[in-house]
């Protein structure tokens, strides 16, 4: 079974410059992808197997390398170390970070670049951005986004973690669940209730909380189905005291800030999934070409050809939908429905690709040292995280319904 020992090749950027203009990328995007591909191939992928086995990767070491490359600087203010580049650069980076040989590190990186820092970059005070944003852009600090709770996942308005005023400080109590980077993070962007107002969409604030604060406790890393080397914990806040100036932007606007960045988070998730799913298909074709069964290779079987062809077509359609959505977003259009469609599609396609490719590999695909097995475990989260499939369908139908009402 020599195929099990085959060295996985790092995928190059999904697209390269040519005489045909790319839909959303230009030369700087390709240059960033090439630089990132080189770093992943030389510094990250050689260590992935060991990090996955140990259940932890060195976030500060990896983030510092990525920070020096400018991965965390996109869409961030130049005054705080950002590059101010467009959202298409975020997608170019997210797409290329998918070349990492596991889902754990891309997810962890995207938390810092596209989840914990956007609201801070846009609405935070100068002092907050100097304290938390600048070193996060440089890769000196690792951050988490802390929104979900044990009883509040899709229903963000139902969170119970609260903060009460004590002079010029906030006293925070509650807990947060499924916190990516939580065991290694230096600080977290935390959504808390800051008033008892009945309007659950206007009583919440985003607060920067240093995770070495007195009263912050972390669970042992959670034992997950996939994303093994990404540390995920439950955070507990027991009378945690921070300055009220650590509130990002306006008090009571936290829910709105969080909702506004969900679209970008979801598009980044779609981008991250493209290369790994392409890799699953490509590696399965290689294996099927070598594997003999009943005197023929698996790839000679028409049903295998049809299955792989369909997966390729669906992946290309998803890629095209992503690019169309990003282009519309960069032009200022409302892309809530398109984003929900793309996010729904990548989640379902991830399950389909990894399941059907694993089926072609058979027993060999069931072994943990096979990349197909890891992909099967890692990318199941795409239908759950950043908005589950059911929420995406609600968003799509809401837009459908409004559209039809206008026609009546």
Curated annotation (Swiss-Prot):
Entry EC number(s): 1.3.8.4
Cofactor section: FAD
GO CC annotation: cytoplasm; intracellular membrane-bounded organelle
GO MF annotation, one: acyl-CoA dehydrogenase activity
Keywords: FAD, Flavoprotein, Oxidoreductase
TM region positions: none
Active-site residues annotated for this sequence: 265
GO biological process: fatty acid beta-oxidation using acyl-CoA dehydrogenase; L-leucine catabolic process
Similarity comment: family membership: Belongs to the acyl-CoA dehydrogenase family.
Subunit structure: Homotetramer.
Protein name as it appears in the record: Probable acyl-CoA dehydrogenase 6
């Amino acid at each position: 079974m020599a195929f099990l020992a085959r060295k996985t090749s790092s995928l190059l950027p999904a697209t390269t410059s040519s005489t045909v203009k790319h839909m959303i990328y230009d030369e700087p995007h390709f240059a960033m992808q090439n630089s990132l591909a080189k770093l992943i191939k030389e510094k990250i992928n050689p260590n992935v197997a060991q990090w996955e086995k140990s259940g932890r990767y060195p976030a500060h070491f990896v983030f510092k390398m990525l920070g020096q490359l400018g991965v965390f600087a996109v869409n961030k203010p130049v005054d705080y170390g950002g590059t101010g580049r467009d959202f298409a650069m975020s997608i170019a980076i997210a797409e290329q970070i998918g070349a990492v040989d596991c889902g754990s590190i891309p997810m962890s990186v995207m938390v810092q670049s596209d989840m914990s820092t956007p609201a801070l970059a846009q609405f935070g005070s100068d002092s907050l951005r100097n304290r938390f944003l600048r070193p996060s852009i440089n890769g000196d600090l690792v951050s988490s986004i802390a929104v979900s709770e044990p009883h509040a996942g899709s229903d963000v308005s139902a969170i119970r973690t609260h903060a009460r005023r004590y002079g010029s400080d906030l006293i925070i109590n509650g807990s947060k669940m499924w916190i990516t980077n939580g065991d290694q993070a230096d600080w977290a962007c935390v959504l808390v209730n800051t008033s008892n107002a009945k309007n659950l969409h206007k009583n919440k604030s985003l607060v920067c909380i240093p995770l070495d604060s007195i009263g912050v406790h972390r669970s042992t890393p959670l034992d997950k189905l996939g994303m093994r080397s990404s540390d995920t914990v439950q955070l507990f806040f027991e009378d945690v005291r921070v300055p009220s100036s650590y509130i990002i932007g306006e008090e009571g606007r936290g829910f709105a800030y969080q909702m506004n960045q969900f679209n970008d988070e979801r598009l980044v998730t779609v981008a991250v999934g493209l290369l790994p799913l392409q890799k699953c298909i490509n590696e399965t074709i290689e294996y099927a070409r070598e594997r003999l069964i009943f005197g023929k290779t698996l790839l000679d079987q028409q049903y295998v050809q049809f299955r792989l062809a369909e997966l390729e077509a669906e992946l290309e359609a998803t890629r095209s939908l992503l690019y169309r959505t990003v282009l519309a977003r960069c032009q200022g259009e409302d892309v809530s429905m398109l984003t929900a469609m793309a996010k729904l599609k990548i989640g379902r396609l991830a399950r389909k690709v990894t399941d059907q490719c694993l089926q072609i590999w058979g027993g060999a695909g069931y072994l943990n040292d096979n990349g197909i097995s890891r992909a099967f475990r890692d990318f199941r989260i795409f239908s759950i995280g950043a908005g589950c499939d059911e929420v995406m369908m609600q968003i799509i139908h809401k837009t459908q319904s409004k559209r039809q009402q206008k026609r009546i």
